[in-house]
Structures are given as C-alpha cells and as structure tokens.
Amino acid sequence: MQLKTFAVLFLIVLAACQSNESKTSTATGPMTINGAGATFPYPIYSKWFDEYQKAHPNVRINYQSIGSGGGIKQLTAQTVFFGASDGPMTDAQLQAAPGAILHFPTVLGGVVPVYNVTGVTQPLRFNGTVLADIYLGKITKWNDAAIANLNPGVKLPADDIAVVHRSDGSGTTYIFCDFLSKVSPDYKQKVGVATSVNWPAGVGAKGNEGVSGLVRQTPGAIGYVELIYALQNKMSYGSVQNKAGQFVTASLDSVTAAATGATMPDDFRVSITNADGANAYPIASFTWLLLYEHPKDAARGSAMVDFLKWALTDGQKFAPSLGYAPLPQPVVAKEMQALGKIQ
C-alpha cells in the first residue's frame, strides 16, 4: 500500500515538474518589446531590429511606423514601451507624460521637396520663401516668376501646383515647418511648427509612403518626404538654398554638414534646420528614440539600453546605404553616458 502511495506521489511530482518546465520554456522565449512612431526612420529601424535579433534571438523588437505624433501619444499612454519622433517633444508634452522621458538621437536625415512636373527632367531649385509661399497657397502655378527666377533655362509648364502634405502627426512635417518658419515670417505666423498643423492649402496623405504615392500619381504635385523615400521611389527632388545662399542637394555629406556646428544640449533636443555652413543641407534633422527614464519593466528597459548601445555603434554602419548619415562621434559619446540614467 505504501509503495502504491509513493508511486502516485511520484507521478504527481513528475507531472508538476514537467508543467513547470513547459512554463519556463515559454517564459524564456524571445522577449517582445513594442514601439511606435516616426515613419522618417522606419527603413533604418526595420534593418536594425532585424539585424539585432539575428545576434540576440532572445529579443524581438516590433515597431509601427504611425507617425511621430502617434508615437508620442502611445508612449505617453504607455501602450508601447518606446516611441520615436523626428521632432523633439515639447515641454508641455514632456510634462503631460506620467514619467520622465529621455531623447536619444539615432541617425541624421534630410527632408526633400519631391515633385511631379510634366516635361521637367532636370532637378529644380527651391528656396525657403518659395516653398513657404507654395504651402501657403500664394504660389499656385509651376511657371510662377518666383520659381522661374530660381531655375533659369528650365521650361516650366503653366500647370497648377497640387500641394501634398501629411495628414497624420508627423516629425517630417515638424522638420519641414521648422525650416520654413525660420525663413518665412508669414509662414511662422500662419502655420508655425508642430507635428500636426493647420494647412492653408493642399491635400493630406498618411506617412512618407502616402505622400510619395500621391505625388507620383498626381501630375503637377509637390510634397516633402525623407530622402530615402525619394530614392526608393525614384522620384524627382530639388535642391534647396541654404543659409549661406548655396543651393544644396540632400546627401550624406550635406546632412552631416548641417550637424557639424550644432551644440548638443544635455537633453538632446536640438534643431539643425537652416544651419550655418556653405555645404549644409537646410532641411536636415536628427531623429530620436524616446524612452522612459524609469521604465516599469526593468528587464525590457535593460534590453533597450543594450539595443541602443549596439545601434549607436555597430548599427551605424547600416545607415549610409539607406540614405541616413551616421551620428557624429561626440554625440554618440554623450548618449552612451546618458543611457546610464535608464534604470
């Protein structure tokens, strides 16, 4: 009788052990970390998350490119673990969050004016005033004298300009408006700088993808997208006159030049649009990954710190092939110190 009782107890213990092993196996599967935000860095973030998981199969990072405004809202609501934005959060947004949020620049990029003008094959030249007046609805024809004067020798059609802008909360919009507000007092007063603004003219499209698609399918259209979207979609994009009076095309070198003279504050919230320097592209920006200083989940917080350390060092080599400029080394060094705050 005692032997039978022992056998039954043994089977119960064995079953419990097997059940616990099954639970442990599930618990030790890939840690999932969810984030959302800017479409501007989506190509490089997708590459990074894929490459990082190859080397760290125990961590899976998911990212939704819903726009900077949406990313900030979801991070503030704590429905995602991290956010991403091309425009730094405002003081009011930071104060509205349930905890301190830190900004970490990840790469540099440029926003370019893309267009679909019948019969025009060569790159067009723009300046801030012309772009501002187009988006204010003041310039409505492609052969307007203001555009023609910047492009001597180019036969511009008398077609209407179809203005395309973002319909969602967008860091790309923030960068574009930040530049235009610096060079056009009228634009600053009537539109201003934000991830979502009240547009005086045009039609909206969601994401860099949406703007690219709408411009491509609309004769006479003009829009603004991150450089990689123009390159991937083989779109025409123009050079833009910088603060030094030079017409500069967006490139890795010209975007990097825009960041060269920037003084990086301790909170990393800095604007580099309309920067000094003859070679600086004027519509350039850092893009930021956003994390709570004291995350609720310490394990995920530690995993994101490890990921960022990789992204800021080994991960930078993937940036140039995707149209982004790597971070300057002094910025990386400053961020490495700041990562120690997350705990």
Task: Locate predicted features.
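Bacterial N-terminal signal peptides that target proteins for export
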Residues: 1-7
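C-terminal motif of bacterial Sec signal peptides marking the signal peptidase cleavage site
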Residues: 13-16
